[in-house]
Design a protein with these regions (language model features):
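AMP-binding/adenylate-forming catalytic core of the ANL superfamily
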Residues: 3, 147, 154, 271-272, ...
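Conserved AMP-binding/adenylation subdomain of ANL enzymes
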Residues: 81-99, 109-153, 166-172
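Active-site glycine-centered loops adjacent to acidic/histidine catalytic or metal-binding residues
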Residues: 105, 189, 213, 239, ...
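Gly/Ser/Thr-rich phosphate-binding loop
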Residues: 124, 152-156, 165-232, 246
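Conserved ATP/PPi-binding loop(s) of AMP-dependent carboxylate-activating enzymes
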Residues: 240-244, 255-290, 329-331
Length: 336
């Protein structure tokens, strides 16, 4: 049903759709455009690798359009490979013989970068999981997969851990499995509340790294670089800027604010390798959306502050800031 509606709304309709059928929940097919995966696979032959230039684009990934219409993020091949391969060791402390699991949808930036490209560029094993943290079949599915596949580190969204915590607050499922190979939990995609981080730390006796990045960047802007030097956790912060990113906090006049002061978080240009060089078919919009408000800086559209120790606190999107009697209050601060 949803596919039909999407195709009806699309300005550029696909000639064919490849459908992977589920035995327990088969989709109704349109014989004019739908092909099953099995039929498409029949007679398929290996294709030779295509030689590409480093500045050619690897893919187009559309954002949700938080700041207007959806934007087609493009990624240059050379910079993408260099950046992602660097992160596997230096941010995540993964070795080529380790097992890595990014529990995300493969169609999102986390899936692109850390289910497919980064681990495979680096040469380690990557886990691709189709399911949910709860209900497929229970709140222990993450721990079962980690145990069975000897996963060293897990990368997921805070919402996933909150869902598990709600279903299994005492960690009874966690206790059923051998998780001796498990080392760290990395969180991103939204702000991780301190209660959730502390709950998992206590349950697992493992570090929890809440780090921050965007579809536009394809890899972390801030993190604890566990393969270089680990810093103490500050609950509610996303650690410190990763090498390659020079972060500032600016007020509405474009002036840098002091430590602990709320403002717009920006990145001083140039951006490091692996970030988006433009928008698909929209070079002008790329500059107007991201590089114009604060000349010389990339506008992240996230608000927060940097404390006296250099830790970055992402509190909300800039359009979620509430002005009360001249005081800028973030949704993150209100939640706490």
């Amino acid at each position: 049903m949803y596919k039909r509606q999407a195709l009806e709304l699309a300005n550029h309709k696909p000639e064919k759709c490849i459908i992977f059928q589920r035995e327990k929940d088969k989709a109704d097919l349109n014989p004019k455009i739908d092909i099953t995966w099995e039929d498409a696979h029949k007679g398929a032959k290996p294709a030779e690798c295509e030689k590409m230039n480093s500045n050619d684009y690897a893919y187009i990934l559309y954002t949700s359009g938080t700041t207007g219409l959806p934007k087609g993020i493009v990624r240059d091949i050379g910079g993408h490979i260099v950046a992602l391969k660097w992160t596997m060791k230096n941010i995540y402390n993964i070795e080529p013989d380790d097992v890595w699991w990014s529990a995300s949808d493969i169609g999102w930036i986390v899936g692109h970068s850390y289910i497919v490209y980064a681990p495979l560029f680096y040469g380690c094993t990557t886990v691709l999981f189709e399911g949910k943290p709860v209900g497929t079949p229970d709140a222990g599915v993450f721990w079962r997969i980690i145990s069975e596949h000897k996963v060293k580190s897990l990368f997921t969204a805070p919402t996933a851990i909150r869902a598990i915590k709600k279903e299994d607050p005492n960690g009874e499922f966690f206790k059923k499995y051998d998780l001796s190979k498990f080392d760290k939990l990395f969180l991103a995609g939204e702000r991780a509340d301190p209660d959730t981080i502390k709950w998992f730390e206590k349950l697992s006796n493992s570090p929890v790294i809440d780090h921050w990045w965007q579809t536009e960047t394809s890899w972390a802007i801030t993190s604890d670089c566990t393969g270089i030097e680990s810093f103490p956790v500050k609950y509610g912060s996303a650690f410190k800027p990763v090498p390659g990113y020079d972060l500032k906090v600016l007020n509405s006049e474009g002036e840098e604010v002091g430590a602990g002061k709320m403002g717009d978080i920006v990145v001083k240009l140039p951006l490091p390798p692996g970030t988006f060089p433009t928008l698909w078919g929209a070079d002008k919009r790329y500059k107007e959306n991201y590089m114009t408000t604060y000349p010389g800086y990339y506008q992240t559209y996230d608000a927060g502050h940097i404390d006296e120790d250099g830790y970055v606190w992402i509190m909300s999107r800039t359009d979620d800031i509430i002005n009360v009697a001249g005081h800028r209050l973030s949704t993150g601060a209100i939640e706490e």
